[in-house]
UniProtKB/Swiss-Prot annotation:
Name of protein: Large ribosomal subunit protein bL36
Keywords from the UniProt entry: Ribonucleoprotein, Ribosomal protein
Organism, as annotated: Chlorobium phaeobacteroides (strain BS1)
Top-level division of the source organism's lineage: Bacteria
Gene Ontology terms: biological process: translation
Gene transcribed to yield this protein: rpmJ
MF annotations from Gene Ontology: structural constituent of ribosome
Keyword Ribonucleoprotein included in the entry's annotation: yes
Entry GO CC: cytoplasm; ribonucleoprotein complex; ribosome
Length: 38
């Protein structure tokens, strides 16, 4: 998982979610697209 100040969807399967005040990108199709903000 990569940590960025600005997260973006990298494909149409990526989803942006919030957990415990942090924003995440999760992607079932391409797990290397995982990102975290903050």
């Amino acid at each position: 998982m990569k940590v960025y100040s600005s997260i973006k969807k990298r494909c149409e399967h990526c989803r942006i979610i919030r957990r415990k005040g942090k924003r995440f990108v999760i992607c079932r199709v391409n797990p290397s697209h995982k990102q975290r903000q903050g």
